[in-house]
Amino acid sequence: MLGLGSIAKKVFGSPNDRLVKSVRPIIAKINDMEPEFEALDDAGIVAKTAELRNRALNGEKLDDLLPEAFANCREAAKRALGLRAFDVQLIGGLFLHRGNIAEMKTGEGKTLVATFPAYLNGLTGEGVHVVTVNDYLAKRDSEWMGKVFTALGMTTGVVYPRQPDQEKRQAYACDVTYATNNELGFDYLRDNMRGSIAEMAQRGHNFAIVDEVDSILIDEARTPLIISGPTQDRSDLYMSIDKVIPLVQEHHYTLDEKTRQATFTDEGNDFLEETLSAEGILPEGQSLYDPESTTIVHHVTNALRAHKVFTKDKEYIVRDGEVVLVDEFTGRMMPGRRMSEGLHQAIEAKEGCKIQPENVTLASVTFQNYFRLYGTLGGMTGTATTEAEEFADIYGLGVVEIPTNRDIARIDDDDAVYRTGQEKYDAIVETIAEAHKKGQPVLVGTTSIEKSEMLGQLLTKADLPHSILNARQHEQEAQIVADAGKLGAVTIATNMAGRGTDIKLGGNLEFQIMEAIAADPDADPEEIRNRMEVEHATAEQAVKDAGGLYVLATERHESRRIDNQLRGRSGRQGDPGRSSFFLSLEDDLMRIFGSERLDKMLNTLGMKEGEAIVHPWVNKSLERAQAKVEGRNFDIRKQLLKFDDVMNDQRKVVFGQRRDIMGAEDIAEVAKDMRDQVIEDMVDTYMPPKTYADQWDVLGMKEAAQTTLGIDLPIEAWADEDGVDQEVATERLERAADEYMASKAAKFGPEQMRNIEKQVLLQTIDQKWQEHLLTLEHLRSVVGFRGYAQRDPLNEYKTESFQLFESMLDGLRTDVTEKLARIQPLTPEQQEQLMAQLRQQQAAAAGTEAVASAGGETGETAFPNAIPGFIEDDPSTWGNPGRNDDCPCGSGKKFKHCHGRLA
């Protein structure tokens, strides 16, 4: 019987249905234009892009250009890829353009959908970023969809790790740039550590389309991107402490699996104090509760978490002697990603790996704050409605369910719950054997590498052929996914490994054709293609007759969304399929989040071994438990964002000021304003307002003026003069400091001085910001304890971080003023020494090339294109070039990037 809500929905339609219906007239308009665009030749499509671009630049709204742009893009895709976009794909593209999340089921062609809003927004010339979850997809999509953009007369670029700077800048300068979320975030941080605007890669944050948006903006929201530098080596301490942890008994600590925290009990602390003292780690007479013991306590707690919370082959693997983290949501390895605050080092000690030095944060940003930089943000995923509240609350993004092109034919079974893990796995193996016998391909979803390999062993014992896709086999990922839809295939995958690649019934035709051509290179490729297409059609039909892809999940995830993603691998584009979840009361989710009630009920029912309970209300009960977990995780992310927003406001100020300085030709006025502020603070400190002359610290001010301003004035005599007050003292100090810096500028030359001021200011900003980040990290780690004193930790953090920020700015002004006052031109001897060092560095960098080019010749003739009389060792022969002029050595580089660095 339908409830009132269901009846109302059937009569009036849901809000989502009404939203989709509202754009149907625009889609009809695009369809009406199709014959007109089909009549264009290839040059006509490119000319249409030029026309639309001019109209956009002349102020015509993109919404008004949308029908023509979408019609042009559809025709280009039809010609370049042989794919004609369905109406539902146009609807998805339209909502992306409007800054929404388009929820589109697996196999509905999200990659093609992204080209429509990307093309439309690319007309402005301000750049569009299409964001994917891994480098493979970024490169694949840029090459694949790049054909469409080329047909439209637009440029496409791809950004990837360790890409040469020049190539990266060119990629960002394209109309459409494909990149991973990680690389975009890191490039943003790197750009804000550059020395000049010309060195920056990104050119702004205009419009972004985020593929698998739930994975990036929800799952990874709590993970900050950090650029870090090494700090002191404490590997001996990690190893020493790691030897103590195996001695710890269960009553010495408490473990909270929900929050993944481990803490020592009072009894455990007593045991630790005794053991650490005996081992010589804790100095004699020192207690764990002493302030001096903070570092040791931090390391011991990390070691406990490494042993009791983090499990090998689940959260990480050991490969080539290194601890490599595994993404808990995708099952993929994350090389290069490290846990912070010494936790990674603790795991390295546990596994006996080489301990890498701890790092200090140089710059950081969370995805939550990075993606909020964009003027317009859109996203695509197969599952977003369960997190619609979070998308709306944090990112201001609405979620629109896009209808499928064909009705979903997949059968979704109710969950089967067993008493024990053994019973569950026995049933799974039996079910896989039945499906395999009739030729139905099976995709088995597991939650960890360990469990995927354990299930693999069970299938081997049962003589069932299978493939395993986890972090260890990531190189074969594309091949394994391509074969997963073949007749009788059995594929075990961790969570969502292979996400982003469709599992096609009968296997991936293109892969099969490439393999056949490679196996017989002398044969006619067209003949092979025709033969393979016929064979594939037969195989595809056989798989459909066997029931399509069977997705069999071995556990429920904390998030319903991850479960829905796994389920969505089956039944793409109206194909038949089936999905089942096999659970046990020993599963992590069931155990942690209360399986006691269910266990009692199963006892009451008198269930026998091997029997399962299968009922819709079990599904409802589990979904309620998952919804609770999702709500708790959302609250954590929301609270973390409030803390990060405090730092984000400060980050925007610092990065904004830094960019202004990089873009300014002359910052002499900025340097003078800083110096004047330092002088005012100095006078306030040593000649406090409303005080008499005999209360002034004139000797302290004289010393401060010498140290900070580089000037020596008879300040001690000012106290005896009539009419000298704060204002007069400030004027005298400012005048003397201005004269001193003017004389210094004359020695260096105006252009050189401006360059020095800029470099000193940028370097000092970076140094102070790094120190400030470290201070904020420490504040963040302790401010939670203020709650015990009935004080709001967030308000305390806001207040103190603002005070720390002001203190950082004061320190910045003082340091810049002092550095500029102390800097001196190089003597000829120092210049020669610097030259020798540079020659050594150049030789080391150039290697054999440097030796070959030198060829035993003298300095003068080593530069055949140099200006007349040029001698490398004698700057007086260089002709006084400007920083942006060509270098006099004839290298073709700008002076500032060549010999100008010596100045």
From Swiss-Prot:
Pfam families, sorted: P-loop_SecA, SEC-C, SecA_DEAD, SecA_PP_bind, SecA_SW
Reactions the enzyme catalyzes: ATP + H2O + cellular proteinSide 1 = ADP + phosphate + cellular proteinSide 2
Cofactor note: May bind 1 zinc ion per subunit.
Cofactor(s) listed: Zn(2+)
Signal peptide: none
Function: Part of the Sec protein translocase complex. Interacts with the SecYEG preprotein conducting channel. Has a central role in coupling the hydrolysis of ATP to the transfer of proteins into and across the cell membrane, serving both as a receptor for the preprotein-SecB complex and as an ATP-driven molecular motor driving the stepwise translocation of polypeptide chains across the membrane.
Protein name according to UniProt: Protein translocase subunit SecA
Organism encoding this protein: Jannaschia sp. (strain CCS1)
